[in-house]
């Protein structure tokens, strides 16, 4: 937990989730504070239906809790952070409505506050889903750091909701002001996106994949996953296999096709990702599968898994960090049975082999190219 966020409604001690004393990244930034200052200075009425979209760690929702906002997020971690930050502020979390991007949005929205996400696709999808609840009098304000707001960002607001302009920058943050146009004729929501995989990627070659908005590389198979699919282990005899950080689920689905007797668990902290994995699996496989939105393997019993397959992210929103990968590796070690294996795909420069040796006492290089490595660690 770092310095508190000072707002017109008070100062709030905020933390990311899960809280890690080694993590020096803040749970709020200048754009959160800028948006809250603007709401107070402009006298924006907050007595109606207030919706907060994309609140990264609950900063906006916590500061506005007295107005009983509805938060909509794609992130399990952001949702849990919001619960804990509300508790720190002495607010009963049940007084705030917490929805996911897969839930039905409110029918009427009087104030829409948008924390601009890293994914333009997710922003596009969510604005389409929220548009029916936006009316002529809805106050729409977006917020983000200058480096996060582009011409393409503004065009999405204009194309889906109405005329859009930006504020002056303050502390490298900027606001977006959108005036809803009830007569606007918008194109249909293009999400989810479905396509067939190319040849040469193992058992899933030529098969259909579903990507909901916000999933990494939603319009094509990313090169890291392509490399991983070519070097997946034979898991014959494995009872339970985990696709950890599953994204659209192609890795776990490939395992299900080659080892139909194995139960595959798909895990991701993104609700959009797990929905994508569920559809990808059901379109291609007939085996047994479980789908879990959560913080890695924290909800999985110890010593209950035979193989974990992992392509860990190394970004948290705009920040680069290895905290997520380390948490995934430690969670995998706890969940694996003795003799169980963790297989990891990663960029060469990230040095995951050192982390695996430190944690498991071993690390084997299975495959590599100029950009990626596939590593294997065995739980003793």
From Swiss-Prot:
Entry GO MF terms: 23S rRNA (guanine(1835)-N(2))-methyltransferase activity; nucleic acid binding
GO CC terms of this entry: cytoplasm
Pfam families: MTS
Domain of life: Bacteria
EC number: 2.1.1.174
Primary subcellular site in the record, as a coarse category: cytoplasm
Reaction(s) the record says it catalyses: guanosine(1835) in 23S rRNA + S-adenosyl-L-methionine = N(2)-methylguanosine(1835) in 23S rRNA + S-adenosyl-L-homocysteine + H(+)
Keyword rRNA processing applies: yes
This protein's UniProt keywords: Cytoplasm, Methyltransferase, rRNA processing, S-adenosyl-L-methionine, Transferase
Subcellular location: Cytoplasm
Recorded family membership: Belongs to the methyltransferase superfamily. RlmG family.
PANTHER family: RIBOSOMAL RNA LARGE SUBUNIT METHYLTRANSFERASE G, RIBOSOMAL RNA SMALL SUBUNIT METHYLTRANSFERASE C
Reported function: Specifically methylates the guanine in position 1835 (m2G1835) of 23S rRNA.
UniProt-recorded name of the protein: Ribosomal RNA large subunit methyltransferase G
Biological source species: Streptomyces avermitilis (strain ATCC 31267 / DSM 46492 / JCM 5070 / NBRC 14893 / NCIMB 12804 / NRRL 8165 / MA-4680)
Gene name in the database record: rlmG
């Amino acid at each position: 937990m770092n310095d508190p966020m000072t707002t017109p409604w008070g100062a709030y001690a905020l933390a990311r989730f899960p809280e890690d004393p080694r993590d020096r990244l803040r749970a709020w930034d200048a754009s959160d504070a800028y948006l809250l200052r603007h709401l107070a200075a402009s006298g924006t009425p907050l007595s109606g239906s207030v919706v907060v979209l994309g609140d990264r760690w609950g900063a906006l929702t916590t500061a506005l809790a007295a107005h009983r906002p509805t938060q909509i997020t794609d992130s399990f971690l952001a949702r849990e952070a919001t619960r804990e930050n509300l508790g720190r502020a002495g607010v009963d979390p049940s007084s705030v409505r917490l929805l996911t991007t897969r839930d039905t949005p409110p029918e009427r929205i009087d104030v829409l506050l948008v924390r601009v996400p890293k994914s333009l696709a997710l922003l596009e999808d969510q604005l389409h889903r929220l548009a029916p609840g936006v009316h002529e009098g809805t106050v729409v304000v977006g917020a983000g750091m200058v480096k996060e707001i582009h011409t393409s960002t503004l065009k999405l607001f204009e194309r889906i909701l109405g005329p859009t302009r930006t504020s002056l920058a303050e502390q490298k943050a900027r606001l977006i002001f959108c005036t809803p146009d009830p007569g606007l004729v918008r194109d249909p929501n293009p999400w989810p996106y479905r396509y067939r995989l190319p040849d040469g990627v193992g058992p899933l070659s030529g098969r259909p994949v579903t990507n909901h908005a916000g999933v990494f590389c939603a319009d094509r198979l990313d090169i890291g996953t392509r490399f991983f699919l070519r070097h997946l282990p034979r898991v014959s005899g494995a009872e339970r296999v985990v696709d950890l950080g599953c994204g659209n689920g192609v890795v776990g689905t490939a395992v299900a096709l080659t080892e139909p007797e194995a139960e595959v668990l798909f895990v991701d902290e993104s609700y959009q990702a797990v929905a994508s994995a569920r559809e990808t699996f059901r379109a291609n496989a007939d085996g047994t599968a479980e789908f879990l939105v959560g913080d890695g393997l924290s909800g999985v019993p110890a010593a209950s898994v035979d193989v974990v397959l992992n392509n860990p992210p190394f970004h948290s929103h705009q920040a680069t960090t290895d905290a997520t990968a380390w948490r995934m590796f430690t969670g995998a070690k706890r969940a694996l049975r003795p003799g169980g294996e963790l297989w990891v795909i990663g960029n060469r420069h990230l040095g995951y082999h050192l982390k695996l040796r430190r944690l498991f006492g071993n690390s084997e290089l299975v495959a590599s190219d100029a950009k990626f490595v596939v590593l294997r660690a065995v739980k003793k």
